[in-house]
Amino acid sequence: MAGSLYIISAPSGAGKTSLVSKLTEKDSRIQVSISSTTRPKRPGEEDGVNYVFLSVDAFKQKVAENDFLEHAQVFDNYYGTSKSVVESKLAEDKDVILEIDWQGAQQVRKLIPDAVSVFILPPSLKELEKRLRGRGTDSEDVIERRMSDAVNEMKHFNEFDYLVINNHFDTALSELHSIFLANRQACAKQYEKHSVMINELTQQH
């Protein structure tokens, strides 16, 4: 038995983190892959819970050892998804979510073509800006950069298998969960799980 790998991408402010957090509360089979990073630990963060915190040298060593499904440099910090961590979770029949951008999604799909990908969109640019401002943590320059980055990110929505519009949170959560539930009923997945029963049902007497 093995779980499925899911890629979930969205522009900053679309509500991806909140949706994924509620989804994992709702369905115990779904887990989020913990990324590795070289950025400094923030107050309240725990190593191995929020991120795996690595030195730059240790991160580059893992790149050299081909231990990342995808990795990228964001400003002055490196981020990556550990191949071994993801594989161990999938082997436990967990559905694993990678919260990565469109570039990371492209890298992962090359390695794991049957990964299921979902893109989350805000209902409008006006609403996206409102959500970014509502955080109250970013300067005007940062908000402008995030809005510009968001437009570039959203141009890649059609590279994904599914699209969820986060207009009403509960509706978007239900739609996102339905993707996971439907994928578990895929013929190949069901046969893997119930092969003995199905073979018995389809034997000629």
UniProtKB/Swiss-Prot annotation:
The UniProt keywords, alphabetically, are:
ATP-binding, Cytoplasm, Kinase, Nucleotide-binding, Transferase
- Output the CDD domains linked to this UniProt entry: GMPK (cd00071)
Q: What is its EC number?
A: 2.7.4.8
Q: What is the catalytic activity of this protein? A: GMP + ATP = GDP + ADP
Which PROSITE patterns does the record associate with it? GUANYLATE_KINASE_1, GUANYLATE_KINASE_2
Keyword check for Coiled coil: no
Q: Which domain of life is it from?
A: Bacteria
Annotated ranges, domain Guanylate kinase-like: 3-181
Record-annotated residues binding ATP? A10, P11, S12, G13, A14, G15, K16, T17
Localized where?
A: Cytoplasm
Report a single Gene Ontology molecular function: ATP binding
Give the matching Pfam families.
Guanylate_kin
One GO CC annotation = cytosol
Q: Which family does it belong to?
A: Belongs to the guanylate kinase family.
Quote the NCBIfam families the UniProt record gives.
guanyl_kin
What is the role of this chain?
Answer: Essential for recycling GMP and indirectly, cGMP.
Provide the protein name: Guanylate kinase
> From which source organism is this entry?
Hydrogenovibrio crunogenus (strain DSM 25203 / XCL-2)
